[in-house]
């Protein structure tokens, strides 16, 4: 009887082993995975096997997405110990370790068991690839407790379900490390890692140097990542207990693929897979602009990307070295204008809003303390420099105290946080008086909206609108240079009586531009209305408009490549402000070379908001039956169907980029080899790997990095794609221009054939074409 039972158990064990061996997602103990073999997760989402990245001949054991056409590796076992032939074999040993052997049967890589696992509990260990992309070692029959898992030892990829952070009990710290290059998965220069000192936060480092800091979690998001918002793709979660602190996310729809990757160039970016394009689409970046550079403005300095210069001292502080500050070196930061009165108990706090909170490594926190008690605790400690709520939800709760200097602060237009900065009581009284005077002036300005100048004043300033003062002719009338009685030089936009800009457009331009403040937008100073006369008074830009340089055979040489690329970046920042960062969401609708002015330092200033349209906070598109704009710059969907969106401006920006690079107009472009316009010509050259041939010869000597110019051309082509959905948002454009993020291949541009512009498709549209090919046009669509 006993022998029968033993035989029965042996049969069951043998049968179970056979079933496991037949499973495509499992390896059993001592079973071998050879180069050329793979195991695939049960749902077919991920595959494990050997691969060679890019043009490399080295072999690695890795995990990649199974269902997509582009091999995307999410984890590499032997990243620093490559195989040099096809001899690699993988086994799971009886003690629960994964072992990778080379041709000499030497172990070149092995897994380490989880700190919490007990080898005594091992029984029939197996290795399995899950549909989450997690490669696990577990006991046969136990799918809950893992002996080891790849998600505990990530490489450059943050996958759904991974606990990205630190376990205080086991000491396990899960962090990202970049590849050395796109075809070399060995340990790269960049890491993104949780620092538990003070209030935990993530630090992106290049080797040992901090590049970017996320800031602490405030209950809704990291304070240094305002773009992290609830979305339909994934649901994120932050867990902070006595045992562990980590950030994780889960897919809202398992069929949607998304990943966060630390690229070899240090860019920490999220991508989503677009099936119809068969490519990864950029979705979000941790770093947005130069203000994200760690401690750019030094101690007690704050960075605002919409200001020029970007750095300024917090209220109550002054530059430590004024000369360096003026020269653009802000690294030494700021110091207190008035020393603290801590010993006398007369200090107070100034509330500063919409901030990225300072570095919290030297901070202290209490999750439950109320804000009033938080303030008292800070006042009792002379080294306490600021305080803030730990969690901003439900009106705020908890307490963070900072000790020592406040560093790495920046300002946002939205989703920033309140910080209470310690100042001497006398300093607070001074600031309150200044604030009261400023508020009074602002109220007066809001009541008046803009200063009104009478006709006589404007006429005298422009010498009676003399021909000698005329700067140029726009679509809505002439522009004159003027000098006010106070000596200030101005530009006067005088609307012609036959101008197509009616009262509506005039009011629109006043209301819009009066509310806009950005270093890359022209500043309006006042207006004049007298019977049929309507005029706008702007700050004067001595270098006039961009088109007077790039399209002029002689003056184009004054704009070398460094200046041109800065102009492109300036225009991009200005458009991003209009689309996302201003109090209003604005579509310009007439972005072109003649509407970009240049100041004395050749900084770009976007002008002419007569055609601009505002959208609601969540709107991104609208329709019109009155199409207005300029041929050569208007997007196809707008010119043909009257459909305009933020992507319409992106199209115009792309045209402008290609014009700046080439020194040629899109409209009227001629080439002996074809009948394409500039967009079509640039696209054709790009496809033939000859994009460099469109570069303006005037910048050849100053163009020391051809790859930068080719990248700008590439970005321009992405902006002018036919389908608006394919075009990037301006936030992505700014990021592409300021980083080395990977770029998708551009698709066919819109209106790339000059000869077939639109006449065959729009017979119902009555075109009203102005005599000047480069003036603003108006199309009345009767539909």
From Swiss-Prot:
Q: Kindly indicate where the leader peptide sits in this chain.
A: 1-23
Looking up Pfam families in the UniProt record yields: B_lectin (PF01453), PAN_2 (PF08276), PK_Tyr_Ser-Thr (PF07714), S_locus_glycop (PF00954)
Q: Which GO terms describe its biological process?
A: recognition of pollen
A GO molecular function term, named singly, is: calmodulin binding
Which residues belong to any copy of the EGF-like domain? 287-323
PTM-bearing positions, type Phosphoserine: 499, 594, 607, 771
Glycosylation: residue positions: 30, 95, 189, 381
Enzyme Commission code: 2.7.11.1
- Ranges for domain Bulb-type lectin: 24-150
Under CDD domains, the record lists: B_lectin (cd00028), PAN_AP_plant (cd01098), STKc_IRAK (cd14066)
Which UniProt keywords are given for this protein, alphabetically ordered?
ATP-binding, Disulfide bond, EGF-like domain, Glycoprotein, Kinase, Lectin, Nucleotide-binding, Phosphoprotein, Receptor, Serine/threonine-protein kinase, Signal, Transferase
Entry's InterPro entries? Bulb-type_lectin_dom (IPR001480), Bulb-type_lectin_dom_sf (IPR036426), EGF-like_dom (IPR000742), Kinase-like_dom_sf (IPR011009), Pan_app (IPR003609), Prot_kinase_dom (IPR000719), S_locus_glycoprot_dom (IPR000858), Ser-Thr/Tyr_kinase_cat_dom (IPR001245)
Q: Which residues form the active site?
A: 590 (proton acceptor)
What is the name of the protein in this document?
A: G-type lectin S-receptor-like serine/threonine-protein kinase At4g27290
SMART domains hit by this protein: B_lectin, PAN_AP, S_TKc
Please name the taxonomic classification of the source. Eukaryota, Viridiplantae, Streptophyta, Embryophyta, Tracheophyta
In this chain the Protein kinase domain maps to: 465-742
């Amino acid at each position: 009887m006993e022998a029968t039972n033993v035989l029965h158990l042996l049969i069951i064990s043998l049968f179970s082993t056979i079933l496991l061996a037949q499973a495509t997602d499992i390896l059993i103990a001592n079973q071998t995975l050879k180069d050329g073999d793979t195991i695939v997760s049960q749902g077919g989402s991920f595959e494990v096997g050997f691969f060679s990245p890019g043009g490399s001949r080295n072999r690695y054991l890795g995990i990649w997405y199974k269902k997509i056409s582009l091999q995307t590796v999410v984890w590499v076992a032997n990243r620093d110990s490559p195989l040099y032939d096809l001899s690699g074999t993988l086994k799971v040993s009886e003690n629960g370790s994964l072992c990778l052997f080379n041709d000499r049967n030497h172990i070149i890589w092995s897994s380490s068991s989880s700190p919490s696992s007990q080898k005594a509990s091992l029984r029939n260990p197996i290795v399995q690839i899950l549909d989450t992309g997690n490669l696990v070692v577990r006991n046969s029959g136990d799918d809950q407790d893992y002996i080891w898992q790849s998600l505990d030892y990530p490489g450059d990829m943050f996958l759904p379900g991974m606990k990205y952070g630190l376990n205080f009990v086991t000491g396990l710290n899960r962090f990202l490390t970049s590849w050395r290059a796109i075809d070399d998965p060995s340990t790269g220069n960049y890491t993104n890692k949780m620092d538990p000192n003070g209030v935990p936060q993530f630090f992106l480092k290049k080797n040992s140097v901090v590049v970017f800091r996320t800031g602490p979690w405030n209950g809704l998001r990291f304070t240094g990542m305002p773009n992290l918002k609830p979305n339909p793709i994934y649901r994120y979660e932050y867990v902070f207990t006595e045992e562990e602190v980590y950030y994780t996310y889960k897919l809202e729809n398992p069929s949607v693929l998304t990943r966060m990757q630390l690229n070899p160039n240090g860019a920490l970016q999220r991508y989503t897979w677009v099936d119809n394009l068969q490519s990864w689409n950029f979705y979000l970046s941790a770093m947005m602009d130069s203000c994200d550079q760690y401690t750019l403005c030094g101690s007690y300095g704050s960075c605002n990307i919409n200001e020029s210069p970007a750095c300024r001292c917090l209220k109550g502080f002054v530059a430590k070295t004024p000369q360096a500050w003026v020269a653009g070196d802000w690294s030494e930061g700021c110091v207190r204008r008035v020393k603290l009165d801590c010993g006398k108990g007369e200090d107070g706090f100034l509330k500063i809003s919409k901030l990225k909170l300072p570095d919290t490594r030297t901070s202290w926190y209490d999750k439950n303390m109320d804000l009033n008690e938080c303030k008292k605790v800070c006042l009792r400690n002379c080294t306490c420099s600021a305080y803030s709520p730990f969690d901003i939800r439900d009106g705020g709760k908890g307490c963070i105290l900072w000790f020592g200097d406040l560093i790495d602060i920046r300002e946002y237009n939205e989703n920033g946080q309140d910080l209470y900065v310690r100042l001497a009581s006398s300093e607070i009284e001074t600031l309150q008086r200044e604030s009261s005077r400023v508020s009074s002036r602002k109220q007066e300005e809001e009541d008046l909206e803009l200063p009104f100048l009478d006709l006589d004043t404007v006429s005298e300033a422009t010498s009676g609108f003399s021909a000698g003062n005329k700067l140029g002719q726009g679509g809505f009338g002439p522009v004159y240079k003027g000098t006010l009685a106070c000596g200030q030089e101005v530009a006067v936009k005088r609307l012609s009586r036959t101008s197509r800009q009616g009262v509506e457009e005039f009011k629109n331009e006043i209301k819009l531009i009066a509310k806009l403040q950005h270093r890359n937008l022209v500043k309006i100073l006042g207006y004049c209305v007298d019977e049929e006369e309507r005029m706008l008074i702007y700050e004067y830009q001595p270098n006039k408009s961009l088109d007077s340089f790039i399209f002029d055979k002689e003056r184009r040489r004054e704009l070398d490549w460094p200046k041109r690329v800065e102009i492109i970046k300036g225009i991009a920042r200005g458009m991003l402000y209009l689309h996302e960062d201003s109090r209003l969401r604005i579509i310009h609708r007439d972005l072109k070379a003649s509407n970009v002015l240049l100041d004395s330092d050749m900084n770009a200033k976007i002008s002419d908001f007569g055609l601009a349209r505002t959208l609601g906070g969540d709107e991104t598109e609208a329709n019109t039956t009155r199409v207005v704009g300029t041929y050569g710059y208007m997007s196809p969907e707008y010119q043909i169907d009257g459909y305009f969106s933020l992507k319409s401006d992106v199209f115009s920006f792309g045209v402008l980029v290609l014009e700046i690079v080439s020194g040629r107009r899109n409209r009227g472009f001629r080439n002996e080899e074809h009948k394409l316009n500039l967009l079509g010509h640039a696209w054709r050259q790009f496809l033939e790997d000859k994009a460099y041939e469109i570069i303006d010869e005037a910048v050849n000597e100053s163009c020391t990095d051809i790859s930068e110019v080719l990248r700008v051309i590439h970005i321009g082509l992405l902006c002018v794609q036919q389908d608006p959905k394919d075009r990037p948002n301006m936030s992505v454009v700014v990021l592409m221009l300021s980083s080395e993020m990977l770029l998708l291949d551009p698709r066919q541009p819109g209106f790339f054939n000059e000869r077939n512009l639109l006449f065959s498709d729009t017979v119902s549209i009555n075109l009203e074409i102005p005599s000047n090919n480069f003036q603003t046009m108006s199309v009345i669509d009767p539909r």
